[in-house]
Amino acid sequence: SNNINLKNLDCEDNQMTFLDVSNNTNLEELGCDYNQLTSLDVSNNINLDNLFCSQNNITELDLSQCLVLEKLECLSNQLVCLNLKNGSWDASVDATNNPQLNCVEVDSIGFFNSDPFNYLNFDKFQFLF
């Protein structure tokens, strides 16, 4: 969609394989759970504060441009790498059930002392700062 004024988009459970929100620069909430997405580009969605993209096939998620994100639910995907490095990360994160997740980019190792990541097995992780 080219609707730059779109603030909320709920397109979950539609069997979509592709979603382009690059022109929706004022998007604040995106719900695209229960689809068949393999990628999701939110680099232009700097106003995004809630992202729900669980139960897809997403392998990488880069949220480095999402400076106001408050809630991320990306559980049950095929995530290998998750980029949370944005200089001010303070969001609630649920990335459970991503068995191949071995790379999380963060600004500080202290981020992993918070509740959102207490359930992950860090033995297989590489931390990037």
Task: Identify the function of each model-found stretch.
Residues 1, 22, 43, 64-67, ...:
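C-terminal helix/turn sub-motif of individual leucine-rich repeats
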Residues 1-4, 15-18, 22-26, 36-39, ...:
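Thr-biased low-complexity repeat/linker tracts and other Thr-enriched repetitive architectures
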Residues 7, 24, 45, 107-109, ...:
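Compositionally biased, intrinsically disordered low-complexity segments
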Residues 7-11, 28-32, 49-53, 70-74, ...:
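Conserved hydrophobic beta-strand positions in leucine-rich repeat
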Residues 14, 35, 56, 77, ...:
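Consensus "Asn ladder" position of solenoid repeat domains
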Residues 80-129:
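Leucine-rich solenoid repeat scaffolds
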